[in-house]
């Protein structure tokens, strides 16, 4: 039987979604040049064995076994698991959550998913968090995952319950967050009949998940749940969706199910492929180490991928300090380096620091670790990193892209060298390869960077006594009063100008201490994310920095905070406008503020109605005192700060411009 056994007959799209991608993974395996191939793609081989062994619920899978010499060694006899016999699909779901060590589930009940909710009723094994909207369940699960480094689990009903989670699913895909979403579905006999609350979730979620499937037989449920957790966390993490028809979760399993092996045996050819890939990686690492000997102006650019392994930021910091290489980050990479270090360039990109943007444009060697090179960090791609491209042509530098996802490499920026695989493992190899090489002096380069730091600081015009406080002042005061406890602080944000002020005026020192929506930019993310982060780390001080417009999209989750007594701190910068959009309208649309201002409720009274303590700051001179009270309050608390309008976010790289063509605050112009 061939390893690359073609699928000859599949009866459903769900089956193709599952098995077609597994076969694709196997084909991908044979072209890998990464030593992490088995760890990353073992799943595909494992599932291919399953295809060969079983006649599954979707149809018979046949394979041509007469034309191949690349075979898997004979498998041992199949064993069977009878532990689920006599249990309903809902009860099997409960047991599978225990198997995967799930401690918390976020979601909302409904008719199509009631067999599962009945099975987990009063379960002592995990806690269920009930928000006021399914979107909030998804964002809370995202934050839970970002803090714990485990997949977040969402459980919702069919139809609108499931479609309400699509935004968090898309957000999780953009930011590489492992999310396992279980959606209820109408009974299999009613599928396609436009039944009440029926929605084609496999079709709807296909473009925003790594993998999705509808379970059509209760016997398939354990296997599908195992696959969901495996796929969500393997390679570049992301969301998966498992659709659960009501009759499947209500039916009882009557026969034992096969116990499937998790790791296949490999023949000699497979082992040769892996050994060849390992040699290729070693050769690439050696070439990069040689470029580090030649480079005079290197920069490290790190993204969210660096935070995937808790040990990677520590290694990165030691590596950059030993080789004296300055480090900049993406928005989602904030916290990977201690921004109090002289080697920190802070955030890169459209609203990043002027000195990070200048350094990226002038660098002759860029080590890009776990990044996507999205448009917010590159500016005009054709004008991005000109000196590194020149150095690459002269074989003395270039752009080196380290990433676990092959599709991210070369998608936006063509690298000089691509190191595909786990970023932490690759960085360990590079660290080892550079231990005994002679590194040139970085004195001139670091001096130039210091000059840029003095010339292009983050700045703003402070408010006068009696005036509304400036939003940047609020972030600086928060930074000041948490400076000694940052190892205990986790911050979430909504999306908008407040998000950028938090990124640039707060000094990030702890890995994964910022939980925000990066790639999709989802307004309303902040409060539900704070709920999820606090559930994940109840001893941490979790602060949601939010704007009034963003907060208003999910503000009803204050009721969730109160119901579960979640000790989040909510800081609202209220300027009664959509600040990021009004900035564009001011600069490029002749101040035509089309529908970007709104009247807000009294947030203090709103919080009070929910049973949550609330404070308000209206003048600059009250800020420090109220901030201290805000931070020292036990339990949930909300502080509304009335801030000045038309405060823009600077620096700012306009669309179509290069990174070094940024607009500065008027005080620096």
Curated annotation (Swiss-Prot):
Family recorded in the similarity comment: Belongs to the TPP enzyme family.
Positions contributing to thiamine diphosphate binding: 134
Cited NCBIfam families: acolac_lg
Enzyme Commission code: 2.2.1.6
Cofactor: Mg(2+); thiamine diphosphate
Key words of the record: Amino-acid biosynthesis, Branched-chain amino acid biosynthesis, FAD, Flavoprotein, Magnesium, Metal-binding, Mitochondrion, Thiamine pyrophosphate, Transferase, Transit peptide
Catalytic activity as recorded in UniProt: 2 pyruvate + H(+) = (2S)-2-acetolactate + CO2
Cellular compartments per GO CC: acetolactate synthase complex; mitochondrial matrix; mitochondrion
Transit peptide start and end: 1-140
Subcellular location: Mitochondrion
Enzyme class per UniProt: transferase
Organism domain of life: Eukaryota
Organism: Schizosaccharomyces pombe (strain 972 / ATCC 24843)
Binding site for FAD: 236, 351-372, 403-422
Keyword Metal-binding (UniProt): yes
Pathway info: Amino-acid biosynthesis; L-isoleucine biosynthesis; L-isoleucine from 2-oxobutanoate: step 1/4; Amino-acid biosynthesis; L-valine biosynthesis; L-valine from pyruvate: step 1/4
Co-factor remark: Binds 1 Mg(2+) ion per subunit.
Recorded GO MF terms: acetolactate synthase activity; flavin adenine dinucleotide binding; magnesium ion binding; thiamine pyrophosphate binding
Annotated GO biological process: isoleucine biosynthetic process; L-isoleucine biosynthetic process; L-valine biosynthetic process
Record bears the keyword Mitochondrion: yes
Pfam families: TPP_enzyme_C, TPP_enzyme_M, TPP_enzyme_N
Name of this chain's protein: Acetolactate synthase, mitochondrial
Region (Thiamine pyrophosphate binding): 497-577
InterPro entries hit by this protein: Acetolactate_synth_lsu, AHAS_TPP, DHS-like_NAD/FAD-binding_dom, THDP-binding, Thiamin_PyroP_enz_cen_dom, Thiamin_PyroP_enz_TPP-bd_dom, TPP-bd_CS, TPP_enz
Binding residues for Mg(2+): 548, 575
